[in-house]
Every structure is written in structure tokens, then in C-alpha cells.
Amino acid sequence: MYNYLGESMKYRLYKIVKCVGTPLFKLIFRPTIIGKENIPLDGRVIICGKHTSNLDAAFMISVPDRIVHTLAKKELFNSKIGNAFFRSMGCISVNRSIHDENAKSEAINVLNNEGAIALFPEGTVNKTDKIILPFKYGAVSFASKTHSPIVPFVITGKYKLFRKSITIEYGKAYYVGDDLEKENEKLQNTIINMLKRKEKDGK
């Protein structure tokens, strides 16, 4: 298993949180997980989808059978405790008010070293009535620069305590071309179509 976290202590903390947190998460929210087999067990990959809640990040850690690095807003790193914890969990700090070149470089470095990145192209939790917010170009840009496959996902339902009311579905992995505008539109449409299919199926 690729370990971009580097230090063994950080690796152990990630494993502890995953081992303890995953059963609790599944016990409390009882999620339905579809298409987990579409996430490669090793090698570079970008996992991305619609952002419905701050709890979505729990799926990024609990479901894949590997270390997954997530992009998180820099405000979470402001305190010493927050900075130590989130970096130990493999999170990459992103300043959303600028084109954060440091975050981009760190994400690309993870992928070039055969790691996994999870991100939400909308850039924030979607609290609107729109099915999806316009996608930023980070996911397709990283995929193009590092020749990493994208695994799209959708989360449907609501997070309700001790009720089987939330579902995450992972789609098939695919590679992008060089036309980032076209590929960003394709990614957005892929996720929209997955959401519409879930709605049609009543799931």
C-alpha cells in the first residue's frame, strides 16, 4: 500500500482512525455502498463527486481499502491541533480564495507517487436547490497532468442516525484527454447522470 504520509506515526494514526471510525460510521449511519470494486487497490487515482455534507469525507476514508488523501479548506488547519490532526490524516490544505499552487503541487506529488486523491469538484457543500454546482477544474487538471484515472461517485439520501438512508455509488474509472473544458463538462455530466439514474430508480 502506498504511503505518502511518510512518517510511520502518521500512518499509524490514519490506520487507528480508519479502524475505529469506520465501524462507528457504518453503525451510526448504516450506508449502502455500491461499486466499491471500481476503486483500484493501488496506483494513482482521483476519486471525486458531488459534495452533499461535511460528513461526506467519512466515506473517503472508510470505504476505500487504501490510504486516500483529501483536499480540505485551509481554515481547518488554523489551530495547532487541527493542523496536526488533518495533516496526519493525509489532508492537503487548500486556500479556496486563490489559485493555491502549493496545494496543486502537493496533490500532483501524491498522484505521481501512485497515491489516491479524493476531492469535491464543486469546491464546497452544495446547499442550493441545484442538482450540482459548477465544477472547478482541479480534478480533470490533476488527471490530465498525471495520467490518473478518475472514479466518479454520488452520494444520495440523508445522513440519519441508525437508519439505512444514505447511499454512495462509485462509477467506473476512466481517463481524461487534453481538452480540460470538454473533460470537465464530461465529468459533471457523468455525475449528473448518475444522480438522475439514482433518482429514477428511487434510491
Describe the function of each predicted region:
Residues I33-I34, I92-N95, V176:
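Short acidic-hydrophobic, aromatic-tinged amphipathic segments that line or gate anion-handling sites
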Residues G35, A72-K73, G90, F120-P121, ...:
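A secondary-structure boundary/capping signal
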Residues C19, K26, L41-I98:
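Catalytic core of membrane glycerolipid acyltransferases/transacylases, capturing the structured
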Residues Y2-R30:
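N-terminal membrane-anchoring alpha-helices
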Residues K26-I34, I98-E101:
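Short gly/ser/thr-rich secondary-structure transition/capping motifs
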